[in-house]
């Protein structure tokens, strides 16, 4: 995997765009075609596997044959990579593990006690109804109809339950992807904050020098000092936020809360894949893969009440409409992200030229340290945009 620091464009825009285009594990499959560490060390690709694997291999829920030996080794090492998130969630996320265990225990058992109770009540009504009494018979038919609707509404087979569990798991994968992007962005934000602090420190020192020359007041110096102190507070706040994201990633992916996995960079965005995306061509597959559509279509086969059949059909159509709208929204989000990346590239090109010029001028004494820090801060901001 290429190091993000070798990129010739904005880190933040690239990370976001990569996450958007690779988020195929979201509840809607969008395109079918196709502990304290703000400063993360950049290991070689041939990293050494930790002696104490994390996540805990004793927590594996799938059988050994579920993955190849190399795949298991990758999941059990102390390295967190974006491409492993789906499998890490599947194996080690507490919610997914609980759902898988529950599904395994309940599969084949009677999952519909409420449904059975309704059916028993229906049988009792028919058994007690007097067929010779028209009023009693009509009342019984009405009561049975109500109970039948309630029974249908409460019926859920194992396949329907699994669809819901799969949807939950896909949502957790998407959440993990967003957290990993957020964590990477926090590194860039930390560099921006530190660069701004360096500039403020230079401004403070320049103000102090001007005061010594009688060109600035004590109030000016104190104001400049307060700016530095406020920036230190902002850095501490950003660090706490990054630590919280780090802990969330650890907990949802099988590490201990104080785990220290080596978190690799989010992969670079695949611009060729973006160029080949076609929401019209992918619409049918995206709708078919939508979890709500799957659920209501499966439910349709279990309904007997015509009212609920019609209602469920409306829910199917609504889910399809929302899936289609979501696909187009995601596609537009990708295009917006690509445009942001292109803008970041151009801004960084300008900032790079300005920095090279400022560096040369600084070397021969044509600009002050404060002027150089201003240009450097602009470059770092452009690089991390």
Descriptions of predicted regions:
Residues 3, 10, 31-178:
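Short flexible linkers and secondary-structure junctions
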């Amino acid at each position: 995997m290429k190091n993000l620091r070798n990129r010739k464009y904005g880190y933040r825009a690239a990370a976001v765009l990569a996450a958007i285009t690779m988020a195929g594990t979201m509840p809607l499959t969008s395109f079918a075609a196709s502990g304290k560490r703000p400063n993360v060390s950049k290991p070689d690709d041939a990293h050494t596997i930790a002696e104490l694997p994390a996540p805990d291999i004793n927590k594996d829920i799938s059988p050994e044959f579920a993955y190849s030996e190399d795949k298991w080794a990758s999941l059990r090492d102390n390295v967190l990579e974006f491409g492993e998130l789906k499998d890490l969630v599947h194996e080690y996320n507490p919610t997914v593990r609980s759902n898988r265990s529950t599904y395994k225990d309940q599969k084949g058992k009677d999952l519909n006690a409420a449904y059975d109770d309704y059916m028993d009540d229906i049988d009792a009504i028919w058994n007690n109804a007097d067929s010779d009494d028209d009023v009693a018979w009509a009342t019984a038919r009405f009561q049975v109809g109500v109970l039948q609707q309630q029974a249908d509404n409460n019926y859920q087979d194992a396949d329907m339950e699994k669809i819901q569990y799969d949807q939950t798991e896909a949502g957790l994968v998407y959440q993990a992807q967003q957290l990993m992007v957020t964590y990477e962005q926090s590194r860039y934000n930390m560099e921006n904050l530190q660069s701004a602090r360096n500039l403020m420190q230079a401004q403070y020192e320049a103000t102090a020098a001007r005061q010594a020359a009688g060109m600035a007041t004590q109030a000016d110096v104190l104001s400049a000092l307060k700016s530095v102190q406020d920036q230190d507070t902002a850095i501490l706040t950003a660090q706490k936020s990054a630590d919280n994201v780090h802990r969330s990633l650890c907990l949802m992916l099988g590490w201990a809360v104080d785990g220290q996995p080596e978190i690799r960079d989010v992969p670079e965005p695949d611009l060729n894949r973006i160029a080949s995306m076609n929401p019209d061509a992918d619409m049918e597959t995206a709708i078919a893969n939508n979890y709500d559509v799957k659920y209501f279509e499966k439910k349709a086969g279990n309904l007997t009440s015509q009212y609920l059949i019609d209602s469920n059909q409306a829910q199917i159509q609504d889910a399809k409409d929302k899936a289609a709208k979501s696909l187009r929204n995601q596609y537009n989000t990708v295009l917006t992200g690509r445009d942001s990346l292109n803008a970041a590239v151009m801004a960084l090109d300008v900032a790079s030229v300005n920095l090279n010029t400022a560096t040369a001028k600084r070397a021969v004494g044509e600009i002050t340290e404060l002027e150089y820090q201003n240009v450097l801060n602009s470059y770092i901001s452009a690089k991390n945009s």
